[in-house]
UniProtKB/Swiss-Prot annotation:
Xref: NCBIfam families: PRK11097.1
UniProt protein name: Endoglucanase
InterPro entries (alphabetical): 6-hairpin_glycosidase_sf, 6hp_glycosidase-like_sf, Glyco_hydro_8, Glyco_hydro_8_CS
Native organism taxonomy: Bacteria, Pseudomonadati, Pseudomonadota, Gammaproteobacteria, Pseudomonadales
Pathway: Glycan metabolism; bacterial cellulose biosynthesis
Function statement: Hydrolyzes carboxymethylcellulose.
Enzyme class: hydrolase
């Protein structure tokens, strides 16, 4: 074989090796499998509510973020187009996305509950802003601006003695007698920083400060745990205090578990990162004290008492605490949770595994957040922008 031919073959081999390595870096099989299972061809996410045929704004918003992390613009376009057309009546500036869509009582299909869920609203706005930035798509930014302005008009309230705060939705969270209800898991610090960067006069940093105060309140959170819901009662025109939500209880469970994940994913340089991790330290104690070393499914924040359930911990709960324990320097606990998630996903997604063995939506969704972060597919910067691994290593989908 001639020297030139040898050199050509070597060069071809190098190109093939680089191409293979890049494919491994740029592909995200976990997202691709998730999309195959839960996302219809038209961009509608199934199984993200109590009924498998219904869709939630939460499911749509999370899938948009996963598509962004996976550099999957085609799916992102479909997800947002379907959401805007079907959940917002094609007018995101006037209509916040109804949180539940499906078959209505009259057998027609459409929005079942027009009340919005602010966590989904914010995830959509965030995904749109970052998609506009990394894919150079101005229309996404225009849509994000309309959505954020709508949120600011309808969901940001000024609370006596606290400041600006985010309501969970337009209806049902402001009550007579000066009572407000909040959901700690609806507020992701990275998003609030990103919105402040985009709209510096809208009060998003004040919302971030109020959320941190809620988590740090020792009267309503004496054991360093996140509750699903928290109440706030005005005591005068200028004062108030956090209380147990009178419409639920002091339980921390399926909503609250996300609060730990968002805290763990916060950029270390953010001035609220360390205080938030400290405010939630009770999860470390509760997890370490369990027989399995896994987070409790249900825990009462006022007493620290764990509800007995034969030691069951959903896979998604372990997934949600990997970044949290890692950020707190509790690497043994983080590794224990990561091992559980890795093992569960490997078994569920094996080619020989039946479809019924795959994780349910909520566990799978939390695992995508956790595994993507652990694999460094994304990181939140101090200004709230997201750093995506594919930006440097992969072809951008324009």
């Amino acid at each position: 074989m001639s020297p030139l031919k040898c050199m050509a073959l070597a060069a071809l081999g190098a190109v093939m090796f680089v191409g293979s390595a890049q494919a491994q870096t740029c592909d995200w099989p976990l997202w691709q499998n998730y999309a195959k299972r839960f996302v219809q061809d038209d961009g509608r996410v199934l199984n993200s509510s109590m009924k498998p045929t219904e869709s939630s704004s939460e499911g749509q918003s999370y899938a948009m973020f996963f598509a962004l992390v996976g550099n999957d613009r085609a799916s992102f376009d479909k997800l947002w187009t379907w959401t805007k057309a079907n959940m917002s009546g094609a007018d995101i500036g006037q209509n916040l996305p109804g949180w539940l869509w499906g078959k209505k009582a009259d057998n027609t299909w459409g929005v079942i509950d027009p009340n919005s869920a602010s966590d989904a609203d914010l995830w959509m706005a965030y995904a749109l802003l970052e998609a506009a930035r990394v894919w150079n798509a101005p229309q996404y930014r225009a849509d994000a601006q309309l959505l954020l302005a709508n949120v600011e008009r309808n969901l940001i309230v000024r609370v006596p003695g606290l400041g600006k705060m985010l309501l969970p939705g337009p209806v049902g969270y402001v009550h007579a007698g000066g009572l407000w209800r909040f959901n700690p898991s609806y507020q992701v610090l990275a998003q609030l920083r990103r919105f402040h960067k985009e709209r510096p006069n809208a009060g998003w940093n004040e919302v971030a400060d109020s959320n941190a105060k809620m988590l740090a309140d020792t009267a309503s959170n004496p054991h360093g745990l996140a509750a699903n819901w928290v109440g706030y009662r005005a005591t005068s025109a200028n004062t108030g205090l956090f209380v147990v939500d009178p419409f639920s209880d002091d339980l921390g469970s399926y909503d609250a578990i996300r609060t730990y994940m968002w805290a763990g994913m916060t950029a270390k340089g953010d001035p609220l990162a360390a205080p938030m991790l400290k405010s939630l330290g009770g999860m470390t104690r509760a997890t370490a004290a369990s027989a399995t070393g896994y987070p409790p499914e249900k825990i009462h924040v006022l007493t620290g008492e764990v509800e007995k359930n034969n030691g069951y911990t959903p896979m998604g709960f372990s997934a949600s605490t990997v970044a949290f324990f890692q950020a707190r320097g509790e690497t043994a606990l983080a590794q224990l949770q990561k091992a559980k998630v890795d093992d569960a996903l490997a078994k569920a997604l094996a080619p020989s595994a039946p479809d019924t063995a795959q994780p349910i939506y909520y566990d799978y969704m939390l695992s995508l957040f956790s595994q993507g972060f652990a694999d460094q597919k994304y990181r939140f910067e101090q200004d709230g922008t997201v750093k995506l691994s594919w930006e440097a290593a992969c072809a951008v989908t324009r």
